[in-house]
């Protein structure tokens, strides 16, 4: 087991690692739209979705990977009306064959350390 960390993605704000590599598989912790330079949430749903994927990109890069190595995503949205924007942004990031994906509408994250409308 190897811990993968980068300063180009938000620091863990709890008892977890940014990513863990086991037997060639990289498991990335759920990312929220934090700007790693300020550790503040970015504003606006499109900016939030882009920031989440940029955080994932930086963690992948820290292990010499890119989005072509992603095989599964779980997308959690506070409001599924933003799902089309997620699809639009993912289409600009991923190429066929697309990764497997599950998407969920999650009740408000306000009870968590940092409330947000999107997690991947």
Language-model features: locations:
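Short, well-ordered amphipathic alpha-helical segments that serve as non-catalytic structural scaffolds
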Residues: 47-61
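Glycine-rich phosphate-binding loops at beta-strand->alpha-helix junctions
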Residues: 74-81
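RNase H-like nuclease fold core
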Residues: 18-43
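Phosphate/pyrophosphate-binding loops at sites that engage ATP/ADP/AMP, CoA/4′-phosphopantetheine
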Residues: 59-70
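Conserved small/polar residues in nucleotide/adenosyl-binding loops
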Residues: 110-116
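Short amphipathic
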Residues: 1-6
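An amphipathic, aromatic/His-enriched active-site/gating alpha helix that lines ligand/cofactor pockets
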Residues: 83-103
